[in-house]
Swiss-Prot record:
It catalyses: L-methionyl-tRNA(fMet) + (6R)-10-formyltetrahydrofolate = N-formyl-L-methionyl-tRNA(fMet) + (6S)-5,6,7,8-tetrahydrofolate + H(+). This is Methionyl-tRNA formyltransferase. Attaches a formyl group to the free amino group of methionyl-tRNA(fMet). The formyl group appears to play a dual role in the initiator identity of N-formylmethionyl-tRNA by promoting its recognition by IF2 and preventing the misappropriation of this tRNA by the elongation apparatus. GO terms for molecular function: methionyl-tRNA formyltransferase activity. NCBIfam families: fmt. GO terms for cellular component: cytosol. It comes from Rhodopirellula baltica (strain DSM 10527 / NCIMB 13988 / SH1).
Length: 335
């Protein structure tokens, strides 16, 4: 028997797969006793085929839902007729979508009385797409945030109902920033739900939120491994942003020549700091005079603090320098 619902309570369908969604979904679950709200079902992406090594990749939303006894569904397409029929039968008031991985078409959005809201990891309309957190770091942005939009069929294109802004820390990686933004997103999601709770129907209320400015739209496509290769002619800050933006995946890398008689060695770069001065272009990619492992770049040098050679454990730049007996002036970076 379902618990009695209050007059302004909401019946949710949650849609998400990755870790970014979990804090906001958990906040919704925790307030059900006080609000009379209900979670009708949780939709996640289907599990991919299991590869020969290891099990299926983690699905934090699935794990969270199952740990709390919530019903879970994983249709191949949220927009196929059978799934739409199932959604409609749930008689939901609101879809809450975050880190799901499928674009909802009009029939899916119209299955709930109030449509859907989506928590996105950027200050829209900047960085629409799959990698907003990473793209903000790679672009050298000093601040970012989260946005909650009232959903339309256009990817991340709906009007903004709530947002929160935060500075990007100088030493923050994409993984660390994403965790922090997921927590900041809880408050923005609550604000958006609070607004929708007072609405009887979308037809009677009219447009929700502030339309996005088309002139300020930028894209945030998925990262590729090729993008992670370091260009040592770039500035130190650009290299630092690349290293932080590419963690935890795909991880920035370079090819080093530690032995002229062997092929270049691929090395993952996991932590750097920069030292800027009037640079000499002839030093780009060379080992610099420094107590640690410093490499010449476009505007000075980058000190490599942590790295991981292919097939080896992570180590300090200094240990790598000592182990390969690198000397100042040596051309370390393969062209």
């Amino acid at each position: 028997m379902e618990p009695r619902r209050m007059a302004d309570s909401l019946r949710y369908v949650l849609m998400g797969t990755g870790p970014f969604a979990v804090p906001s979904f958990e906040a919704i679950r925790q307030q059900m006793d006080s609000t009379g709200d209900q979670i009708a079902r949780v939709f996640v992406r289907p599990l991919p085929p299991v590869k020969s090594r290891g099990g299926p990749p983690p699905q934090p939303v699935r794990e969270w839902a199952e740990s709390h006894g919530l019903p879970v569904d994983a249709p191949a397409s949220i927009n196929d007729p059978e799934t739409i029929a199932s959604l409609t039968e749930l008689n939901a008031d609101l879809l809450v979508v975050c880190d799901y991985g499928q674009i909802l078409k009009p029939d899916a959005l119209q299955s709930a009385r109030l449509g859907g809201i989506n928590l996105h990891g950027s200050l829209l309309p900047a960085y629409r797409g799959a990698a907003p957190v990473q793209r903000a770091l790679l672009s050298g942005d000093r601040e970012t945030g989260v946005s909650v939009i009232h959903m339309t069929p256009r990817l991340d294109g709906g009007p903004i109902v709530a947002s929160r802004t935060t500075p990007i820390r100088d030493d923050e990686t994409s993984g660390e920033l994403e965790v922090r933004l997921s927590e900041i997103g809880v408050d923005a999601t609550r604000e958006a739900i609070g607004l929708l709770r007072t609405i009887e129907s979308l037809d009677s209320h009219g447009p929700l939120g502030e339309p996005q400015d088309p002139a300020k739209v930028s894209k945030a496509p998925r990262l590729s491994k090729a993008e992670a290769q370091i260009d040592w002619s770039a500035t130190g800050r650009e290299i630092d942003c690349l290293v932080r933006g590419m963690q935890p995946w795909p991880v920035a890398f370079t090819h080093t020549v530690v032995n002229e008689n062997k092929p270049p060695l691929r090395v993952a770069i996991r932590g750097v700091r920069t030292e800027t001065y009037a640079a000499d272009a002839s030093n780009i990619g060379r080992v610099m005079e420094h107590e640690g492992l410093a490499i010449g770049c476009g505007d000075g040098q980058v000190v490599i603090e942590r790295l991981q050679p292919a097939g080896k454990k992570e180590m300090s730049g200094l240990d790598f320098k000592r182990g390969h007996r690198l000397t100042a002036g040596q051309q370390l970076i393969a062209p």
